[in-house]
């Protein structure tokens, strides 16, 4: 699943310039994690985004082994002259085939100020005919030197938490990243010799390009 980032344009109490922008992205990760949950041991992805006057819509797809995940999202974002940003959106996560996962639909709220970012998402999973509700809270610190740290917490009918520490930079217009993820046993696919769930730790490397 694609992590929906804060999209911020224009400003409160200021005139907004009529601008439109289309961008594309491709990427590859050594291990595809989303909100602390392993999706696939290496995955390629691609996406397209359209933004105009604070409104955004986009699509993103990734290889998940047993088919393709494709996400569609839309919303509206603002940023004030004081540096506060906010966005409100909707995301649907879909999968080809019927073996990897089922449909997820959620609303997303993102807030940001300085190095601080907050995500709150509330959604429903079809879960192969057994509908369930979930929510997610993510707290992120992002620094100008490329370092970041995230703490994520699953709630409602889901459970678990994870912590991610990473670094991202751009070299010759290529985006490079590395992160370490620590996930609780509720989110882990790891088991011990007795078959009990273990906490999960992973080193993830990424490379990408935006156009």
Region spans (language model):
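Outer-membrane beta-barrel proteins
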Residues: 1-211
């Amino acid at each position: 699943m694609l992590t929906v980032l804060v999209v911020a344009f224009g400003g409160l109490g200021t005139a907004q310039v009529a601008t439109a922008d289309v961008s594309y992205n491709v990427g590859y990760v050594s291990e595809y994690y989303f909100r602390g949950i392993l999706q696939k041991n290496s995955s390629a992805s691609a996406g397209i985004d359209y933004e105009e006057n604070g409104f955004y819509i986009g699509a993103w797809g990734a290889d998940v082994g047993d088919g393709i995940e494709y996400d569609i999202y839309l919303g509206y974002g603002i940023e004030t002259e004081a540096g506060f940003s906010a966005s409100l959106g909707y995301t649907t996560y879909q999968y080809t085939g019927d073996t990897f996962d089922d449909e997820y639909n959620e609303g997303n709220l993102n807030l940001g100020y300085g190095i601080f970012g907050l995500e709150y998402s509330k959604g429903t999973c079809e879960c192969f005919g057994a509908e369930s509700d979930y929510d997610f809270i993510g707290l992120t610190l992002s620094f100008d030197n490329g370092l970041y740290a995230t703490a994520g917490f699953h709630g409602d009918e889901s459970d678990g938490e994870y912590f991610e520490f990473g670094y991202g930079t751009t070299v010759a217009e290529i985006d490079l990243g590395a992160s370490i993820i620590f996930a609780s046993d509720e989110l882990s696919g790891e088991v011990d010799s007795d078959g009990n769930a273990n906490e999960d730790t992973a080193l993830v490397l990424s490379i990408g390009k935006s156009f």
